[in-house]
């Protein structure tokens, strides 16, 4: 009666088509290209950038809700670049079983090749490479290891800002003002998650205008009591919370005469 699927948007389309003949309800948690807006009134701007980079690299970047597009005021791009470089330098790629490793390999050769192709596209399209790049990290001559990669001065029409990379690749995009930041954040086919750092009331006001199913403010973590899911091509339905249970329930009306 219901199909629940987590995966890429491309695969989600095929699942929905396959379920259509049976008129099954379909709930899907699909891709994302989440914006991480660092507001000018953030209490510790450098720390917000630093942690945003490392959050993007979590699970080797293989997270649907990863904050892969960092939005910073154009006037503070230089400051953001320095903090991002420092964060990328802290990332240690290697055997996941080794102490001190923070990033392991990506899942497959197919994904390895896709990520490297997108990194090459970023370079070709004129994004400023400030950390990482194509190929394996030094000292790793085999395995599907990706260099933790950061691009700065990215524009939102570049391939690396449009496509879900699903790897440790961050883009830093400059914005003029709040309206510009909101427009850039919403200029994507995805709508899974969003991240905002700034003065709390200001951040909440921005969060209300971001078209995503979830927004994390000032580093707040996921909450399993809150519904998890997105808008647009990031899927439909919800996991977690009361709404997550309701996806698996049927409504029945019973009428009886006295």
Please report, for each region that a protein language model flagged, where it lies by residue.
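ALDH superfamily catalytic-core signature
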Residues: 2, 8-155, 217
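Conserved phosphate-binding and hydrolysis motifs of nucleotide-dependent enzymes
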Residues: 7-8, 167
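Conserved C-terminal structural/oligomerization subdomain of aldehyde/semialdehyde dehydrogenase
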Residues: 37, 89, 119, 124, ...
């Amino acid at each position: 009666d219901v199909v629940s699927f987590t995966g890429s948007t491309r695969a989600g389309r095929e699942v929905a088509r396959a379920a259509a003949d049976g008129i099954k309800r379909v709930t899907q948690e699909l891709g994302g290209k989440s914006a991480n807006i660092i507001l000018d009134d953030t209490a510790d701007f450098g720390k917000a950038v630093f942690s945003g980079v490392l959050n993007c690299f979590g699970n080797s970047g293989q997270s649907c809700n990863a904050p892969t597009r960092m939005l910073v005021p154009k006037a503070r791009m230089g400051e953001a670049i320095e903090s991002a470089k420092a964060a990328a330098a802290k990332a240690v790629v290697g055997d996941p079983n080794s102490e001190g490793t923070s990033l392991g390999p990506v899942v497959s050769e197919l994904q390895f090749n896709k990520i490297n192709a997108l990194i090459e596209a970023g370079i070709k399209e004129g994004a400023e490479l400030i950390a990482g790049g194509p190929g394996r990290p030094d000292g790793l001559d085999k395995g599907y290891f990706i260099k933790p990669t950061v691009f700065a001065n990215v524009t939102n029409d570049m391939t690396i800002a449009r496509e879900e990379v699903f790897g440790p690749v961050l883009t830093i995009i400059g914005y003029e003002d709040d309206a510009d930041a909101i427009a850039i954040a919403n200029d994507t086919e995805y709508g899974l998650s969003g991240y905002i750092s700034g003065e709390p009331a200001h951040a909440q006001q921005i969060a209300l205008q971001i078209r995503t199913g979830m927004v994390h403010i000032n580093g707040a973590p996921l909450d399993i009591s809150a519904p998890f899911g997105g808008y647009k091509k990031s899927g439909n339905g919800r996991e977690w919370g009361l709404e997550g249970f309701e996806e698996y329930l049927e409504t029945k009306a019973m009428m009886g005469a006295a």
